[in-house]
Amino acid sequence: MPAIITNKFRIHNSEQFQESFSESSANVYYLAIGRPHAFGTSTRPDSRTEFEGSDTSAPTPVDSIQEEFYSFDDFMAAKKVTSNDISFSVPRRNWTTGTVYDYYRHDYGHLVTGSTSSTQSANSGATALYDATFYVLTSDFNVYKCLDNNGDANSTVEPSGTSNSILTTGDGYKWKYMYSLSAAQRQNFLSTDFMAVATNSTVSSAAVDGAVNIVKIKTAGSGGTNGSHTGVAIRGDGSSGACTVTVSGGAVTAVTVTTPGTGYTYGYIRNADIVSAGATSLSGSELDVIIEPKGGHGFNAVKELGGFFVMCNTNFEGTESSNTGDFVVGQDFRRVALLRDIKSGGSAASSTTLRGTKAILLASNSGNFTVDEEINQATSGAVGKVVEWDSSNKILYYVQTRHNDAGADSNGNLTAFSSTHTITGQSSSSTGTPSSASSTVDSISFSSGYVGSEIDADTGDVLYLENRASITRASDQTENV
């Protein structure tokens, strides 16, 4: 049986995601960064290799169980995402002069019959409203919906102003002002490809449910009496709609709505009514009454423009010193992940930030360890990868992955660092002896010299995963992710 999952279901999902931040049993989300070492071909303990792209061409993540497990191996830190960090969004479409924009229609994709039969499509070829280029972002950061493109003409006059009335520009386009991007929205939710979408309360309050403002000419007809014929009824399930039909050369050349009416979910204009209004002998005209979305244009910008995308923007400020300094600086990252309902120390994570690395407190050392070098421990055979070396506090931060030289030992096992056996850096030749004491140093509580990651491995869900070119972090730097 033919069926479809509608775009409203996609919008519903985005609404549910936003609501999940504030429900009584709210989900908890974190944005994590990871992969401090370069992408490349990795050797597995069974001597086979896995291709992981390169630093010049980051690998495309795979939606798989393996990818989710792998991602937890090298998380460096994570920061909680709040409801202020998210926004409904739509594809960004900048107004550009000389462009033919699509106009809003309620019936894209429907088979329209009459003098000709065809699937209703936009000038761009789109057969679905949300695929059509029917809204724009202007240089003033105002967003407008195109209601009429003047017969597929080039747009040459940028719309401006915030009036609730329909705006007709000098190029014949008709626009409806929807909302403006605030300074905060521009800072946090405006990218090259997407932009925030939100309903303007003033515009929403002024919207009229079921009004008709646009009528398009499908077939102009012939034989009619020239002139402007007023009082032509817009029939349908609404009331009071009326228009003026202009006939020139015997054919319909323009339709101007004079009374928008209310309550229309379908409508039509009969050729006979145009004849009765004075266009004697007109025949064959076919007019399309454009039905507005529920509530009217501007009533709900999120639904009207297709806001089934959600943007997330979280700031990482240096070490996040105000939040216990869990973020590493002087190191780079190549992976970003959105995590849901992870655990920390066996319980639901709740801290503003979480440290993703493991750490060893050294009692003594010789030389300085270097970032990204392999470290090995005598006797235990443990292997790891250095993320940060805090020489002042003698804390060695590291990760362990499931590959050779980064976590797997000579037997292919992931062995934990333990006891006071000497740790050696394979590039720097530095050595260190782990402390056997349990103490708190730099806000980190060590047990016999060791502490695990504050992100419990393989808990919760990875909802989003992105590999990217390396970004080097600095203490005076803020990343907007």
For the regions a language model picked out, list residue spans one by one.
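Conserved, function-critical positions that sit in or immediately flank catalytic
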Residues: D171-V481
